[in-house]
Amino acid sequence: MLQLKSIPPAGAAGAMSEPAHITVRGLNKEFNGSVVYDNFDLDIPRGRFVTVFGPNGCGKSTLINLISGLIPTDGGEILFGGKRLSQVKIGYVFQNYREALFPWMSAFTNIEYPLELMKVPKKERVERVQRLVDHLGVRIDLTLYPYQMSGGQQQLVSILRALVVEPEVLFLDEPFSALDYEMSLFMRDQLQRIFHETRTTTVLVSHDLEEAVYLADYVLLLTRRPARIADYRYIELPRHRGDETLAHPDFIEHKRHCLEVFQREVRRQ
């Protein structure tokens, strides 16, 4: 198992005592001559919920796409508890649920599809999906097809599909951006419950600062390109979080601080 030197996240109080699950060192990436990441380092603690926030075009989605192997790096090293990506299972929830689910498959079949690709026998696939659904207390009709379901239900199916392989890490790329506000609130609650039950290391990209602070154990704030860590804010708020969290003085202070960092980066030339 490979080991890389731990780098305490700047501004993340208490992070030094937490073992890194994802270790990024010397990450490089450019598109058409534009440098997105240049010798970028990052540690993500095990079993924590990390949200990624920053200016438009700074490379938020690119970061999780690089870490998850969806796009190749131009250099650097990424390890998962000392292991290479090929040695770990990951789950990924895409931004557009309408394009992520297969419309000719029922919700249940969509969820079990990754297990079919892994050559898991049918009986075991059914058992694993049912066990996951029961464990998380999901109350939707999985015999329905995606086009028969609400947006939130479709995105929940996408999340279940990502979780059915029992991933070490779950990545979510702006999973609520295509949902209306009411459904976004519902899905925040669902995702919190899933995280509480599984304690899967979770990395979520968000364009909504309130959402980023509300869901996170840590908020990773990025600078403009080439992206650096502007701050890595530890959000010390009790879970389960609800409407009362939004009015809590500590939440308001965390959000104010993150907004200040964000605005500073937006104004930076």
Placement of each model-derived feature along the sequence:
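Conserved ABC transporter NBD signature motif
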Residues: G76-V88
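Helix-to-loop junction immediately C-terminal to a conserved catalytic motif
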Residues: S68
